[in-house]
Amino acid sequence: IIEKMFEYGKNNGIFSEKAKFVHVNCSEYANNPELITANLFGYKRGAFTGADNDNPGLIKVADGGMLFLDEVHCLKPECQEKLFLFMDKGNYHVLGDSENEYHSNVFLAFATTENPKEVLLKTLLRRIPIQMEIPSLSKRSEMEKSNIIVRFLENEAKHIHKEIRIGNVVYAALLNNEYEGNIGELKNVIQETCMN
């Protein structure tokens, strides 16, 4: 949904044609919170062990476009606080360069499967001007799930340039499975099913 919003923005002049959409799954960094901060805000060579080159950071890479932080509830409060400060004016510091202030004009989008009021700092939550609640698959009707499955199958057919047909057993399994990872997991299951 977020990427479609970005594409809509590009097609309607909100973002330039060169604007980038950068997706970060914060849960991948849950066991290494320092790494997500370094990758978001960037770092200078020698800032820490293993920093052999400068890294501009994903905030800079997405400058002029959109940075989507998925599973944002996995961010530690220290990183959320840095995001809050960045959202205030678009300025930030790169790890290993506290003297210079950097700027990025990036649209931030967040998603969480948790209750945002319980997992996000109030300072960060107040800065999010538009909040949408998208129901999980478990809360959707069978018709809605069916429409989502059909849409993903059509998209996958276009992607692999083949007609895709599934039997009733596979369809029932797709429809009735409990997807903890929600729509992203359903999409992955459909992609894997179509590859086999």
Mark where each language-model region is:
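Walker A/P-loop
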Residues: 1-24
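Conserved AAA+/SF3 P-loop NTPase catalytic/coupling segment centered on the Walker-B
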Residues: 3-4, 29-41, 52-88, 117-127, ...
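AAA+/SF3 P-loop NTPase mechanochemical coupling elements
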Residues: 17-20, 54-64, 76, 82, ...
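Conserved AAA+ ATPase "SRH/arginine-finger" region at the nucleotide-binding site
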Residues: 25-27, 130-145
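NAD(P)-dependent short-chain dehydrogenase/reductase
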Residues: 41, 146-159
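Short gly/ser/thr-rich secondary-structure transition/capping motifs
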Residues: 47-52, 89-94
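Short conserved motifs of the RecA-like P-loop NTPase core
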Residues: 161-179
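C-terminal helical "lid" of AAA+/P-loop NTPase domains
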Residues: 172-175, 184-196
